[in-house]
A protein has these predicted regions:
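Anionic-ligand-binding alpha/beta catalytic cores of soluble enzymes and soluble regulatory domains
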Residues: 3-52
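Phosphate/ribose-recognition catalytic cores of enzymes acting on nucleotide-derived substrates
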Residues: 1, 39-156
């Protein structure tokens, strides 16, 4: 007999980070969905990497970290990007316990505030790290973006 697939089993697979298995079992890509909300505006300011933030409160999250992802808004084609899932210790302080989902859409400057998006993480790039300062975080974000573009085979 095969594995019995239930919602609890899927949640466990996602929490362990096996998003390929979760997607195959769901019959569709595993995704994080929600309305884009305002964040601290630090990503677009200091980090020069604007993000679309969605609340993580009701979502089943994979392990904290950075992922190469596809982002879908409405009926538009998926846009390549990068997503951070975690509690943003460098920006918000260690142990704040409140997870966020922040997606940077490559080459997209559309105002998404209030619109529903689906974030489809496809490749884990690295775990969540506390950086000594925003500049160190910014340098790592640039490396993460390059890694995500490579993983998603972006042509830019």
């Amino acid at each position: 007999a095969g594995t019995r697939i239930s919602s609890s089993w899927i949640r466990n697979v996602v929490s362990e980070g096996d998003l390929s298995l979760a997607s195959a079992s769901l019959g569709r890509p595993y995704s994080l969905c929600g309305a884009v909300t305002h964040g601290k505006e630090m990503a677009s300011g200091t980090l020069k990497c604007p993000t679309a933030n969605i609340s993580a409160d009701a979502l089943q999250l994979p392990p904290y970290g950075v992922y190469a992802a596809w982002i879908v808004c409405g009926g538009s084609p998926p846009v390549p990007g990068i997503v951070y899932i975690g509690d943003a210790p460098t920006i918000r302080g260690e142990g704040n316990g409140h997870a966020i989902v922040e997606a940077n859409l490559f080459g997209c400057s559309v105002d998404l505030y209030g619109r529903d998006i689906s974030v489809i993480p496809v490749r884990f790039l690295r775990g969540s790290i506390t950086f000594p300062n925003p500049e160190a975080l910014s340098r790592q974000v640039a490396r993460d973006v390059a890694a995500a573009k490579s993983a998603l085979e972006c042509k830019e």
